[in-house]
């Protein structure tokens, strides 16, 4: 006889991307902190985003060891989009390739929070990094959006950047927050979009676990989520399985847990 964990409901497996802030109140992620995190929750983490400018801010030797620890646990690392945007502003995008390779980071995020890329330029950079064996994630949206997201526009961008070589699209947290306040029906339509499995939705670490439980309730246990603080990764997996007050211990009523 064995006693097993409750399973996630539905098909597939939603992805989890943590955001590695470095030493921070959201979860210490120095070398030993990352090793402890991965020993406990590594099996539930797919990606680790190296926060903002940390590829430059954190000394290279310890950061390389952190990246190597993630790689050993089969967690893919990628640099945050702010680093790309800064390099683009400085006219030094190509300098990212040797910097990231030297650190062992094999992925990067391309975003447009504080810069604008025309579609041809965006797709060219995605292809440029793919040709150099980087995995590329594109982030859709801005940190201060002016109006609710247009699903047709988002769908077109997902299709275009996937064709250019991006393997996933992250939807900026601020875009989701604005939609939730102004027209939550858009989120219901988003869940039915044929390209929904190609995106990760950013969550707000400061709104854990309420917002995360709400996203699971709205999109299902296998929704792919990004921006997860390291200290929240294990509890998030519990929420996905119906464990915790945030989901009212739905493991006891599995028929009520969204697929």
Where are these regions (language model features)?
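Conserved N-terminal beta1-alpha1 strand-loop-helix module at the mouth
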Residues: 1-67
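Hydrophobic faces of well-ordered beta-strands that scaffold small-molecule active sites
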Residues: 13-21, 45-50, 75-81, 108-110, ...
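Active-site-adjacent beta->alpha loops and helix N-cap segments on the catalytic face
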Residues: 30-32, 55-69, 86-96, 112-134, ...
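Glycine-rich phosphate-binding active-site loops on the catalytic face of alpha/beta enzymes
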Residues: 52, 103, 107-114, 160-178, ...
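C-terminal alpha-helical cap/extension of soluble enzyme domains
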Residues: 7-11, 194-259
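N-terminal and secondary-structure boundary signal
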Residues: 1-7, 19, 29, 52, ...
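Active-site mouth loops of central-metabolism enzymes
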Residues: 12-32, 51-56, 78-92, 139-153, ...
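Generic structural signal for hydrophobic
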Residues: 37-41, 70, 99-103, 129, ...
């Amino acid at each position: 006889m064995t006693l097993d964990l409750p399973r996630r409901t539905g098909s597939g497996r939603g992805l989890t991307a943590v955001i590695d802030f470095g030493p921070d109140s959201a979860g210490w992620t120095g070398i030993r902190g990352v090793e402890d995190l991965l020993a406990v929750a590594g099996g539930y983490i797919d990606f680790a985003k190296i926060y903002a400018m940390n590829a430059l801010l954190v000394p290279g030797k310890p950061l390389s060891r952190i990246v190597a620890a993630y790689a050993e646990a089969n967690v893919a690392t990628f640099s945050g989009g702010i680093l790309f945007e800064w390099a683009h502003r400085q006219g030094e995008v190509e300098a990212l390739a040797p910097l990231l390779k030297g650190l062992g980071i094999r992925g990067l995020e391309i975003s447009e929070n504080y810069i604008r890329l025309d579609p041809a330029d965006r797709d060219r950079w995605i292809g440029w990094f793919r040709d150099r064996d980087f995995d590329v994630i594109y982030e859709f949206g801005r940190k201060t959006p002016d109006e609710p997201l247009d699903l047709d526009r988002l769908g077109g961008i997902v299709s275009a950047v996937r064709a250019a070589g991006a393997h996933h699209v992250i939807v900026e947290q601020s875009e989701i927050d604005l939609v939730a306040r102004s027209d939550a029906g858009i989120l219901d339509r988003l869940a039915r979009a044929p390209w929904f499995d190609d995106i990760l939705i950013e969550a707000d670490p400061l709104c854990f676990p309420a917002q995360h439980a709400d996203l699971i309730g709205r999109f299902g246990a296998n929704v792919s989520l990004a921006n997860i603080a390291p200290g929240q990764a294990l509890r998030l997996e519990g929420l996905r399985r119906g464990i915790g007050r945030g989901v009212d211990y739905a493991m006891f009523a599995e028929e009520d847990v969204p697929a």
